[in-house]
């Protein structure tokens, strides 16, 4: 992560600070400075006109100091800076020193276009009136053209900046913009307006490519329905220029490694997110369809088909956010349905289904916390799910449609050495006192939970998983970015049901993985794990029964919409 840009010319700032109110600053992110030309830098003001004391006598005994226009600092705080001047003979030089002291105090507090002005005044009574000009940001001008609407960027800067203008607030707003996945880089310059304390922010915004598309191959499905799958995925970071995102994929299953099952194995998902406010309130819509056919012997002769649908709508709102911490809250409504056919006829196989049908709805509340620093990243999300009885649920009598589950996911990534070795710890937890259908149960086994076992090796109402691993960089590019990681890992999990047999079943493994990520759109991973619990091998031809999990994704991004951006060096 690149650090926030620094002042372009500190010498100019000091010179201008000593001449009056500081009215120019440029922020850059390791890029060429916008708008430089021969002679004086663009945006650097000439010294302010002389605002000295017109009617002041050569010397006067200063009896008091009054302040006008200050809101950031109280009269008492400002007076404390210059109180030693009171009671002494004061001339023009001393008055200028008072003005500079107060202006310096504003500048040191990052109010870079605020300061003190001593207007022409009659000081025969010994009282000095110091006028405080507290600066403001009047306009944000995006100087180039792009697909992303300018209001998306400017509103998020205004969200962080208030009057009077503080440099720390402005840098924070710019950093939030820079971190946005739609933005590749920004160039900014803070330039003076026509009046004292008035400033404008000029920006050049370079957007990321809008669309991405790719292909993937993996063995991340249960072997019973064909572990290998081919995937076509696509996405856009900015579909309609409002900053909205759309992501989708379509997958085909494969029976063993011999024949692609196009008719019955096609699954797809779509997820759409629309920002509603400058506070990053987002509307999220989702749809997922999964159609499976049991391919594994001896059940493949029964012609068992499963059709599952999921619909969701949600709102997400950040509650607190700074450059290191973010706390957000998501409220989501979700409806799931499943239909099972055996030889073309509805048939109840899974517990809780009625004539092969299952329908459930739930309201999910998810607080989420993220912490980021140079050394570590911590992310945690907990989801409280409340089953609903209002939307015509279809469940067996032994299941309560108004169920409750509590699920937690957390990860800790820590840099443990100077050569970019990472310690990664992942935690999963689900708890419920209710008996829930398989769509709401937690699965243990597979590359995302307990490596070295089949996907969905255990499916239980309650579960706990911890997975520590070390990621050793074994190959880096010329810039020092790690491309290949060697990953030893240990996975441990335990699962149990809420009703019926409550025996806790443990599942644990150890192994080694390797990942290769040469670009943002190309990734490869291979994991081998040894499961220490023997559940019996049902298909000697499946790689998952040998503890092997793989994935390959090849993609590309296209359409750079930015016009008149600063060229890359």
Where are these regions (language model features)?
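N-terminal secretory signal peptides that target proteins for export/translocation
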Residues: 1-16
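Bacterial N-terminal signal peptides
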Residues: 20-32
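Periplasmic polypeptide-binding modules associated with outer-membrane biogenesis and secretion
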Residues: 36-221, 227, 233, 249-266, ...
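Gram-negative/organellar outer-membrane beta-barrel architecture
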Residues: 147-151, 163-370, 531, 540-562
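Membrane-embedded beta-strand positions of outer-membrane beta-barrel proteins
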Residues: 213-217, 234, 246-250, 283-287, ...
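Hydrophobic core residues within well-ordered beta-strands of beta-rich domains
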Residues: 230, 311, 327, 363, ...
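C-terminal outer-membrane beta-barrel translocator/porin domains of Gram-negative envelope proteins
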Residues: 339-484, 488-492, 496-498, 537-543, ...
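C-terminal beta-signal and terminal closure region of outer-membrane beta-barrel proteins
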Residues: 502-569
């Amino acid at each position: 992560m690149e650090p926030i840009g620094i002042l372009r010319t500190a010498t100019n700032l000091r010179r201008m600070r000593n001449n009056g109110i500081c009215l120019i600053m440029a922020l850059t992110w390791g890029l060429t400075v916008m708008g430089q030309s021969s002679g004086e830098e663009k945006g650097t003001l000439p010294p302010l006109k002389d605002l000295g004391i017109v009617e002041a006598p050569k010397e006067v005994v200063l009896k008091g100091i009054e302040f006008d226009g200050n809101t950031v600092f109280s009269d008492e705080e400002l007076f404390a800076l210059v109180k030693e001047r009171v009671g002494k003979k004061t001339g023009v030089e001393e008055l200028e020193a008072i003005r500079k002291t107060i202006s310096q105090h504003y500048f040191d507090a990052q109010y870079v276009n605020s300061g003190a002005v001593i207007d022409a005044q009659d000081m025969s009574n010994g009282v000095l009136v110091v006028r405080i000009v507290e600066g403001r940001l009047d306009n944000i001008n995006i100087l180039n053209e792009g697909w992303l609407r300018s209001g998306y960027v400017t509103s998020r800067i205004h969200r962080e900046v208030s009057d009077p203008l503080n440099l720390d607030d402005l840098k924070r707003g710019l950093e939030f913009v820079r971190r946005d996945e739609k933005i590749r880089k920004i160039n900014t310059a803070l330039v003076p307006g026509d009046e004292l304390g008035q400033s404008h922010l000029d920006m050049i915004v370079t957007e990321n490519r809008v669309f991405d598309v790719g292909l993937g191959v993996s063995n991340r499905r249960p072997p019973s329905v064909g572990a290998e799958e081919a995937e076509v995925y696509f996405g856009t970071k900015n579909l309609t220029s409002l900053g909205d995102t759309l992501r989708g994929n379509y997958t085909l299953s494969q029976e063993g490694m011999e024949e692609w099952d196009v008719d019955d194995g096609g699954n797809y998902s779509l997820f759409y997110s629309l920002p509603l406010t400058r506070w990053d309130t987002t509307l999220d819509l989702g749809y997922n369809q999964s159609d499976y056919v049991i391919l594994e012997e001896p059940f493949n002769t029964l012609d068992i088909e499963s059709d599952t649908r999921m619909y969701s709508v949600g709102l997400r709102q950040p509650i607190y956010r700074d450059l290191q911490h973010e706390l957000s809250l998501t409220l989501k409504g979700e409806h799931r349905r499943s239909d099972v056919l055996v030889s073309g006829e509805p048939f109840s196989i899974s517990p809780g289904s009625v004539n092969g049908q299952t329908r459930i709805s739930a309201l999910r509340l998810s607080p989420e916390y993220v912490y980021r620093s140079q050394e570590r990243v911590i992310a945690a999300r907990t989801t409280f799910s409340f089953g609903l009885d209002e939307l015509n649920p279809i469940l067996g009598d032994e299941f309560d449609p108004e169920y409750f589950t509590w699920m937690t996911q957390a990860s800790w990534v820590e840099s443990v050495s100077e050569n970019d070795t990472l310690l990664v710890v992942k935690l999963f937890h689900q708890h419920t006192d209710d008996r829930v259908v398989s769509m709401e149960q937690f699965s243990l086994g597979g590359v995302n939970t307990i490596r070295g076992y089949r996907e969905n090796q255990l499916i239980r109402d309650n579960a706990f998983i911890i997975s520590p691993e070390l990621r050793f960089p074994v190959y880096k590019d010329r810039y020092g970015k790690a491309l290949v990681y060697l990953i030893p890992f240990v996975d441990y999990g335990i699962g149990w049901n809420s009703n019926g047999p409550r025996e806790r079943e443990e599942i644990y493994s150890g192994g080694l993985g390797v990942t290769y990520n040469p670009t943002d759109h190309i990734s490869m991973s291979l994991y081998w794990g040894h499961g220490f619990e023997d559940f019996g091998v049902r298909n000697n031809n499946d790689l998952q029964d040998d503890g092997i999990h793989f994935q390959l994704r090849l993609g590309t991004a296209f359409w750079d919409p930015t016009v008149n951006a600063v060229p890359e060096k």
